[in-house]
Amino acid sequence: MRIAFFLLVLAVIIGFAYGYSCPKPCYGNMCCSTSPNNQYYLTDFCGSTSACGPVPSCSGALYFTADSQRFGCGKYLNLCRSGKCVKAQIYDAGPAMWVEQDAGMMIIDASPTICHVLTGGSSCGWSDHFLITATVTSLTDSRPLGPFNVTESEMAQLFIDHEIAMAQCEAEKTCNGFDLE
């Protein structure tokens, strides 16, 4: 009986430690899948190369993210946490799949400015477990890049807009690693 209990506890611990597995690996070391509930951990980055063209400067108030393999280069995301949101543009790919596996969840890599706006902190690592919601913006969204607040009904509309935008990019094969097929 003790052995069975020990094995059960061990299985639960291993399940938590290795609970995340990317449903759609791509580019050798990244995940092309999107979160079914739009929930991600927030991390920050400032790179010297970009998968989508020019490298944004890491100084100043800039609103950019990675995750082009999921959503497409140049697309816009609304990143939200506790009613506060930031509209950002996708400039790069990433993060590496091993980072998400270590975190146990999908990640949105964003500029240090976004990290500060949404958390009040100076850095965001996967072990901080800053949970955010990420949605692709509507094609008709004219909101400028940067922070904004949302009500519950506005947040619900962001989810609707996200579903429409994702259906379009999947039809056009410009997201979720469709260019690999």
UniProtKB/Swiss-Prot annotation:
Protein keywords: Antibiotic, Antimicrobial, Bacteriolytic enzyme, Cytoplasmic vesicle, Disulfide bond, Glycosidase, Hydrolase, Signal
GO cellular component, one term: cytoplasmic vesicle lumen
First-tier enzyme category under EC: hydrolase
UniProt keyword Iron-sulfur present: no
Observed phenotype of the null mutant: Mutants have only 40% of the wild-type lysozyme activity and initially form plaques on bacterial lawns that are only half the size of wild type plaques. Despite the lysozyme activity remaining constantly at 40% of wild-type, the efficiency of plaque formation gradually increases over several weeks repeated plating until the size of mutant plaques finally exceeds that of wild-type cells by almost 2-fold.
Proregion residues excised on maturation: 139-181
Single GO MF descriptor: lysozyme activity
Temperature notes for this entry: Stable when incubated at 50 degrees Celsius for 10 minutes at pH 5.5. Activity decreases by 50% when incubated at 60 degrees Celsius for 10 minutes at pH 5.5.
Secretion signal, residue range per the UniProt entry: 1-19
Catalytic activity, EC: 3.2.1.n3
Subcellular location as annotated: Cytoplasmic vesicle lumen
PTM per Swiss-Prot/TrEMBL: Contains six disulfide bonds.
GO biological process, alphabetically ordered: defense response to Gram-positive bacterium; killing of cells of another organism; peptidoglycan catabolic process; phagocytosis; response to cadmium ion
Keyword Secreted: no
Reactions catalysed, as given in the entry: Hydrolysis of 1,4-beta-linkages between N-acetylmuramic acid and N-acetyl-D-glucosamine residues in a peptidoglycan
Family classification: Belongs to the dictyostelium lysozyme family.
Function (record text): Has antibacterial activity against the Gram-positive bacteria B.subtilis, B.megaterium and M.luteus. No antibacterial activity detected against the Gram-positive bacterium S.aureus or against the Gram-negative bacterium E.coli. Lacks chitinase activity.
Name of the protein: Lysozyme A
Phylogenetic lineage: Eukaryota, Amoebozoa, Evosea, Eumycetozoa, Dictyostelia
